[in-house]
Design a protein with these regions (language model features):
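Membrane-interfacial terminal anchoring regions of lipid-handling membrane enzymes
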Residues: 1-30, 39-43, 60, 66-69, ...
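Non-catalytic C-terminal accessory region of glycerolipid acyltransferases
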Residues: 132-242
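Short, basic, glycine/proline-bearing loop/turn elements
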Residues: 49, 120-124, 154-155
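Catalytic core of membrane glycerolipid acyltransferases/transacylases, capturing the structured
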Residues: 22-34, 38-43, 54-56, 70-128
Length: 242
């Protein structure tokens, strides 16, 4: 209970004061310093995510950092356990990246502003046309040299078995010809989703797997790509969550 009392006001206060950082970002925009602007946005959002995870009491263990590609855009693909997954990933994978996120997040004040700054794309999964438009937008971002992150289950598992991955999500990598880096999240649901809205400190593991070069896959391998990536990711989960 005490952690929840500290967590929610702490996050809200950090969001309220965060627009102050826009002064530097706007200055860099005016000066046309796009690279410096991108780096500044990343540092701000990365630091905020680390603060959120610190407030949560999460003890994070990261495996496979050596598999992170830093000199080209990639598509990170992960299972989805909790509302904490986005700040968890932002705090542990230290390269600029946008997220394919559910449309509801676009309505969240301040948070949606920062999500747009890091090139997040908001997807309406219940509307086929708008979902396709979101994928096209994500492909364009990847082609521009900026990495993206997607949860192809389309919903949170909350510690239950991992749902099947939607094949359409992988068009992001196939159409932009970027590598895929599978990521396993294990235990994030214990921070919130398993506690009825209360924050509880817990151990969380993030496993970053070896990249997959989609340009070297056969047609058969491409048709099974969503299942292959899912198998890689769930291999690091407890059996009852696979």
């Amino acid at each position: 209970m005490l952690r929840s009392i500290l967590f929610y006001p702490g996050v809200i206060l950090s969001l309220i004061i965060s627009p102050i950082a826009l002064i530097r970002i706007k200055y860099l925009e005016i000066r046309g310093k796009d690279k410096e602007r991108t780096n500044a946005i990343f540092k701000i959002t990365h630091s905020w995510a680390k603060y959120v995870m610190w407030l949560s009491g999460a003890k994070i263990n990261v495996h496979g950092r050596e598999n992170i590609i830093r000199d080209e855009a990639v598509l990170f693909v992960s299972n989805h356990q909790s509302y904490f997954d986005i700040p968890l990933i932002m705090s542990t994978i230290d390269v600029p990246q946008g997220f394919i996120a559910k449309k509801e997040l676009e309505k969240w004040p301040i948070i949606s502003m920062w999500m747009k700054y890091i090139h997040c794309v908001f997807m309406d999964r219940e509307n086929i046309r708008k979902s396709a438009e979101a994928i096209v937008q994500g492909i364009q971002i990847l082609k521009s040299g900026y990495s993206m992150f997607i949860f192809p289950e389309g919903t949170r598992s909350k510690g239950k078995s991992t749902a099947s991955f939607k094949a359409g999500s992988f068009k992001l990598a196939l159409k932009s010809k970027v590598k895929i880096i599978p990521v396993t999240i294990n235990g994030s649901y214990k921070l919130l989703d398993a506690n009825g809205g209360k924050i509880k400190a817990s151990d969380v593991e993030v496993c970053i797997h070896e990249p997959i070069d989609v340009t070297k896959l056969s047609k058969e391998e491409i048709s099974e790509l969503h299942s292959t990536v899912r198998d890689i990711i769930v291999s690091k989960l407890p059996k009852d969550q696979q």
